[in-house]
């Protein structure tokens, strides 16, 4: 969608931003970063360089999801470093089967699926909790199974029973926390909090663990409210900010791209999100983030009737296009947690 080229120099301040503040997008630096996308036409995770606008031809790296109903509509992918399985891509798919979608860890070096599980909801986002080996999914709704509904909506944690092990492969062994419309999850390694976004809320959770350090649940410690469906949640790799998107059009006053920060107040012994400020007054943005050099990149849908685009937008230069592609989300490939 080319309307972003008309908006690159325009910033709409949020209701919580300082009155009269105005920002103009800075030109991108020349640093060459790698971008990972989920592409639903081929149903692949693909890697490209942000140094080129032509993304046609074979991707620099790609992985094709199996041709089964639970693997349809890849929805998220994030590159993470593990101690026992090297660099992996944690990924999820909405799925179309009555049993739901999928979550998985795919090893980068040989593209082997080292772990996977069916998630009865429609997984929109996935994360790995560093230091615990747990996989987290966010599902916007439950998925029908036969004549009943399984509790697949919300936040679901697949937690290894021992340190260094793989998570369970059965959803029955996962830990579930309700969150209507859950669309995004992110492990905040600086604050050691799990962040999640869904209908009308951005939440922060602390991990609840047993005496052996194994996760047994989540404790909600902070909430930021807004109107609409929170869609994506990403770090700002150029600052300590958290970036999130809220869906909708002009009928929703809180649509667009927002930033905030999570902080702990030792005086009150409480966690809180900073007052948010709106970066851009955009509609239907599916993902948005900033690279370490400040370059912004995003995927937006042409309208409310669809959810993909053949284009990934970048600040300071022309967009990157792959003819016939259906990009749903774009991520910074090179981010790893130690």
Regions found by a protein language model. Name each.
Residues 64-69, 116-119, 175-179, 223-227:
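Surface loop/turn motifs at the tips and blade-to-blade linkers of beta-strand repeat domains
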């Amino acid at each position: 969608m080319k309307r972003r080229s008309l908006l690159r120099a325009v910033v709409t301040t949020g209701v919580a931003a300082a009155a009269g503040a105005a920002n103009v997008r800075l030109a991108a630096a020349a640093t060459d970063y790698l971008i990972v996308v989920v592409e639903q036409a081929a149903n692949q995770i693909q890697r490209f360089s942000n140094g080129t606008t032509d993304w046609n031809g074979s991707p620099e790296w790609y992985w094709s999801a199996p041709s089964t109903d639970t693997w349809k509509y890849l929805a998220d992918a994030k590159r993470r470093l593990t101690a026992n399985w090297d660099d992996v891509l944690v990924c999820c798919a909405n799925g179309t089967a009555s049993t739901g979608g999928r979550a998985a860890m795919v090893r980068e070096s040989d593209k082997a699926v080292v772990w996977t599980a069916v998630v009865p909801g429609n997984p929109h986002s996935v994360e790995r909790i560093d230091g615990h080996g747990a996989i987290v999914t966010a599902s916007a709704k439950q998925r029908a199974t036969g004549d009943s509904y399984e509790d697949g909506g919300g936040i679901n944690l697949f937690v290894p029973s021992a340190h260094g092990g793989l998570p369970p492969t059965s959803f029955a062994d996962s830990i579930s926390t309700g969150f209507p419309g859950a669309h995004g999850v992110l492990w905040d390694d600086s604050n050691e909090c799990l962040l999640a976004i869904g209908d009308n809320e951005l939440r922060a959770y602390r991990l609840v663990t047993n005496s052996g350090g194994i996760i047994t649940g989540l404790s909600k410690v902070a909430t930021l409210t807004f109107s609409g469906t929170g869609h994506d949640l990403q770090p700002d790799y150029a600052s300590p900010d958290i970036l999130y998107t809220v869906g909708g059009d002009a009928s929703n006053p809180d649509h667009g791209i927002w930033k905030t920060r999570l902080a702990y107040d030792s005086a009150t012994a409480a966690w809180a999100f900073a007052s948010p400020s709106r970066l851009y007054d955009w509609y239907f943005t599916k993902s948005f983030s900033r690279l370490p050099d400040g370059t912004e990149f995003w995927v937006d849908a042409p309208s409310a009737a669809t959810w993909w685009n053949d284009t990934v937008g970048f600040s300071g230069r022309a967009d990157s296009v792959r003819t016939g592609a259906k990009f749903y989300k774009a991520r910074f490939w090179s981010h790893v947690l130690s």
